[in-house]
């Protein structure tokens, strides 16, 4: 069964930003769309051009070091980012091997305030800057409905949508790329832009279960796996380590609403390399885990959607544990 009229219900996944992107590490960190992926990450809408506006606020302090504990060397640290971004998604008017094809584009501008503070109130640095972020693009996405795999809509189900929902499994492999277009200054620590490319092969899976109550239409379970491969920053003779990342969401579908929990996990899997040696003697490995509520609603009157997500970060290694607030609104042009 190929779902051909799945509308804006599945657009929001591509207009989200990963809280994991908000870490001021010198090296490995996850690259991805503004806010990360969450609900419906494997779905594509019908052919056409879609756009969205996304806002992000990140607030953290108490830099955690290599042992995942608050750094005693920098107890007065601070991390704040406010970002606004725009996203475009184009779904091509043809299919390949039974699946839809699309490309996306994300661009944001941000203000960041980052401080590393020594005991006694002295600062290593206190950076307060604004500028454009690196461009992120899903160069090509291929989304295909695989099958029911045990999940069927019950007879007589009353749905808020005039078309069938894709009960079962949908997959969406993609090839993505982060471009070094952001504001970069070699002596800024850290700079907003990264001055290197990040290649991001990834795959999304979304499974919609049958309804579990008399008032819902099923539970939607989504995951998106990324493998981030960074090129070398030649101006600093530094290469960030590869990062394995996962965005996920579990949401109950209730009419035009999706209500659930979303999160991210990222783990660096190879050393940062500086001047042909492991950076800082340890490889500067990065890790993070974030979790929090997500709320999504379709807006049929404008053929659009609105979404809000808040995540908290109980696990952080070589980064700032942040509280992330993401707001997004989008529609079809």
Stretches with model-predicted labels:
Residues 39-41, 53, 86-92, 137-143, ...:
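Residues on the lipid-exposed face of transmembrane beta-strands in outer-membrane beta-barrel proteins
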Residues 26-30, 58-83, 118-127, 190:
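Surface-exposed strand-loop-strand hairpins of Gram-negative outer-membrane beta-barrel proteins
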Residues 47, 78-86, 128-137, 169, ...:
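Residues that define the transmembrane beta-barrel architecture of outer-membrane proteins
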Residues 29, 64, 70-71, 232-333:
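Outer membrane beta-barrel transmembrane domains
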Residues 32-33, 51-59, 103-111, 171-179, ...:
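Transmembrane beta-barrel strands of outer-membrane/channel proteins
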Residues 60-62, 110-116, 146, 178-188, ...:
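Sequence/structural signature of outer-membrane beta-barrel proteins
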Residues 25-26, 40-48, 60, 93-102, ...:
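Short loop/turn motifs that connect adjacent beta-strands in outer-membrane beta-barrel proteins
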Residues 75-146, 171:
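Long, hydrophobic/aromatic-enriched structural stretches that serve as scaffold segments
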């Amino acid at each position: 069964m190929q779902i051909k009229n799945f509308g804006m219900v599945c657009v929001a996944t591509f207009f989200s930003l990963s809280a994991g992107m908000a870490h001021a590490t010198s090296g490995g960190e996850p690259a991805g769309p503004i806010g990360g992926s969450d609900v419906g990450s494997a779905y594509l809408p019908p052919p056409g051009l879609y756009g969205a506006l996304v806002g992000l606020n990140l607030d953290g302090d108490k830099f955690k070091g290599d042992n995942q504990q608050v750094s005693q060397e920098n107890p007065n640290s601070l991390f704040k980012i406010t970002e606004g971004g725009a996203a475009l998604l184009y779904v091509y008017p043809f299919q390949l091997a039974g699946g839809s094809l699309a490309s996306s584009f994300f661009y944001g501008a941000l203000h960041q305030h980052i401080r590393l503070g020594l005991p006694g109130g002295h600062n290593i640095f206190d950076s307060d800057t604004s500028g454009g972020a690196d461009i992120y693009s899903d160069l090509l996405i291929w989304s295909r409905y695989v099958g029911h795999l045990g999940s069927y809509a019950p007879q007589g189900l009353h749905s808020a949508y005039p078309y069938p929902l894709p009960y079962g499994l949908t997959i969406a492999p993609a090839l993505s790329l982060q471009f070094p277009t952001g504001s970069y200054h070699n002596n800024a620590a850290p700079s907003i832009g990264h001055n290197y490319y990040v290649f991001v092969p990834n795959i999304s899976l979304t499974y919609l279960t049958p309804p579990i109550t008399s008032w819902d239409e099923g539970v939607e379970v989504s995951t998106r796996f990324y493998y981030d491969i960074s090129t070398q920053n030649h101006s600093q003779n530094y290469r960030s380590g590869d990062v394995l990342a996962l965005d996920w969401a579990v949401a109950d579908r209730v009419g035009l609403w999706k209500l659930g929990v979303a999160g991210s996990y990222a783990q660096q899997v190879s050393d940062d390399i500086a001047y042909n040696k492991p950076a800082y003697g340890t490889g500067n490995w990065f890790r993070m885990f974030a979790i929090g509520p997500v709320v999504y609603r379709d807006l049929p009157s404008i053929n659009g959607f609105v979404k809000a997500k808040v995540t908290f970060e109980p696990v952080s290694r070589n980064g700032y544990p942040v509280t992330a607030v993401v707001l997004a609104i989008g529609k079809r042009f």
